[in-house]
């Protein structure tokens, strides 16, 4: 931290200084300009301006609050978008798996239908062959 300047100096602080310096440092004169910088502006002179500053400061505080809320909302929205993207990717993967499984099942069902038709055709052919053999044997005897 920088050293703080003393308002009133002791004799030990000024030993070795020139008389003019000592007189300027130890004199207790305070003009208005020096007091302004040491104590700050006085209240009555800057009353209306001080109200304006407070008003502007309140507006700045409100803007800061709104910006912080907006940033929080953007962060939450980003998190929700990430979750939504993950769910969307999962749904896409599930849709692809469902499509592949449905194609496989369709093929299985088609082959099952073909097998049933082939068995029915074979049974019909055997029945027809039995009937023909019976008719032929009946006429031969």
Swiss-Prot record:
Gene Ontology cellular component annotations, sorted alphabetically: cell surface; clathrin-coated endocytic vesicle membrane; endosome; glutamatergic synapse; Golgi apparatus; Golgi membrane; lysosome; phagocytic vesicle
Keywords: Coiled coil, Golgi apparatus, Membrane, Phosphoprotein, Transmembrane, Transmembrane helix
UniProt entry tagged with the keyword Coiled coil: yes
Region (Disordered): 1-51
v-SNARE coiled-coil homology domain mapped to chain residues: 52-112
Keyword Heme tagged: no
A Pfam family annotated for this UniProt entry: Synaptobrevin
Membrane spanning stretches: 116-136
Subcellular location: Golgi apparatus, trans-Golgi network membrane
Residue(s) carrying Phosphoserine: 17, 30
Alphabetized InterPro entries for the sequence: Synaptobrevin-like, V_SNARE_CC, VAMP4
Gene3D superfamilies given in the database record: 1.20.5.110
Gene Ontology terms: biological process: cellular response to type II interferon; endocytic recycling; Golgi ribbon formation; Golgi to plasma membrane protein transport; neurotransmitter receptor transport, endosome to postsynaptic membrane; regulation of Golgi to plasma membrane protein transport; regulation of synaptic vesicle endocytosis; SNARE complex assembly
Residue intervals annotated with topology Cytoplasmic: 1-115
Membrane-topology annotation of the record: Single-pass type IV membrane protein
Spans within the Vesicular topological domain: 137-141
Coiled coil: none
PANTHER family: VESICLE-ASSOCIATED MEMBRANE PROTEIN 4
Family that this chain belongs to: Belongs to the synaptobrevin family.
Assembly notes: Identified in a complex containing STX6, STX12, VAMP4 and VTI1A. Interacts with BAIAP3; this interaction is increased in the presence of calcium.
Function: Involved in the pathway that functions to remove an inhibitor (probably synaptotagmin-4) of calcium-triggered exocytosis during the maturation of secretory granules. May be a marker for this sorting pathway that is critical for remodeling the secretory response of granule.
Name recorded for this polypeptide: Vesicle-associated membrane protein 4
């Amino acid at each position: 931290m920088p050293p703080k300047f003393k308002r009133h100096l002791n004799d030990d602080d000024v030993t070795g200084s020139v008389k003019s310096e000592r007189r300027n440092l130890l004199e207790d004169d305070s003009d208005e300009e020096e007091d302004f910088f040491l104590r700050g502006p006085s209240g009555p002179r800057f009353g209306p301006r001080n109200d304006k500053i407070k008003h502007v400061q309140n507006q700045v505080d409100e803007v800061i609050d709104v910006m912080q809320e907006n940033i929080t909302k953007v962060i939450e929205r980003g998190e929700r978008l990430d979750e939504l993207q993950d769910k969307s990717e999962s749904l896409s993967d599930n849709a692809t798996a469902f499509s592949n499984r449905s194609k496989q099942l369709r093929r299985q069902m088609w082959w099952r239908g073909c097998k049933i038709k082939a068995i029915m055709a074979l049974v019909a052919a055997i029945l027809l062959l039995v009937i023909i053999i019976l008719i032929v044997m009946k006429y031969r005897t």
